[in-house]
Amino acid sequence: MSSRSYKRVLLKLSGEALMGEDAFGINRSTIVRMTDEIAEVAALGVELAIVIGGGNIFRGVAPGAQGMDRATADYMGMMATIMNALALQDALKHKGVDTRVQSALNIDQVVEPYIRPKALRYLEEGKVVIFAAGTGNPFFTTDTAAALRGAEIGAEIVLKATKVDGIYSADPNKDPTATRYARISFDEVIVRRLEVMDATAFALCRDQKLPIKVFSINKSGALKRAVSGEDEGTLVHV
């Protein structure tokens, strides 16, 4: 069995990752595969918190939101993340993984509100905690929510699951000579103008000395390898 390099981690999942090959919504086989990977990591004894996006259902900055009040559109996006969190919780339940959802928006009949001491207790008890509704405020992305919650719970690293297997010197889909960085500092990312997270989220991680690992969620076993400290994806360090 693989060993863990981190005791407590924050996993950022995009809503789009749940679509799989579909154009919208939640692809069942994709969410089942993701929960297999999450369950495998939880079995290592890693304290795992997850922030999930809502882009597979609605995004405040998407073309469909054009003409809408930005705050209203962002609140709709937050509610989309709650739907995704419930779907992920249900799928994890079927794997026997004890999971709690905490929302930054109060919907008491559906999910419990975000309360930091409770979240910490759940993690210490070995439960997976899913943070929904972003930060609870418009104009902030779920990347920023991941950085914020990661800092609040004392995570040792933010694991950003994407469609590419790390940070490259250029777009690998356009430039065949693009190379993947195994490790890169926060300062180097800024100098090279590489895209990792939105500026607010990136600055928060940098200020809190919270490393980020970017890896592909579509690569089998990548999450476990990232948690085990293997050469998977790209590590952004201080």
Curated annotation (Swiss-Prot):
Disulfide bonds: none
Residues given in the record as UMP binding sites: G54, D74, T135, G136, N137, P138, F139, F140, T141, T142
Enzyme Commission number(s): 2.7.4.22
Domain of life: Bacteria
Coiled-coil annotated residue ranges, if any: none
BP-aspect Gene Ontology terms: 'de novo' CTP biosynthetic process; UDP biosynthetic process
Pfam family, one: AA_kinase
Cell compartment(s), UniProt: Cytoplasm
Catalytic activities: UMP + ATP = UDP + ADP
Cellular compartments per GO CC: cytosol
Functional pathway: Pyrimidine metabolism; CTP biosynthesis via de novo pathway; UDP from UMP (UMPK route): step 1/1
Positions that bind ATP: K12, L13, S14, G15, G55, R59, T162, Y168, D171
Keywords: ATP-binding, Cytoplasm, Kinase, Nucleotide-binding, Pyrimidine biosynthesis, Transferase
GO molecular function: ATP binding; UMP kinase activity
Regulation: Inhibited by UTP.
Keyword Cell cycle applies: no
Primary site of residence: cytoplasm
Subunit structure, interactors included: Homohexamer.
Function (record text): Catalyzes the reversible phosphorylation of UMP to UDP.
NCBIfam families (alphabetical): pyrH_bact (TIGR02075)
UniProt xrefs under HAMAP family: PyrH_B
Family: Belongs to the UMP kinase family.
Name of the molecule in the record: Uridylate kinase
Organism (species): Bordetella pertussis (strain Tohama I / ATCC BAA-589 / NCTC 13251)
Gene name of this polypeptide: pyrH
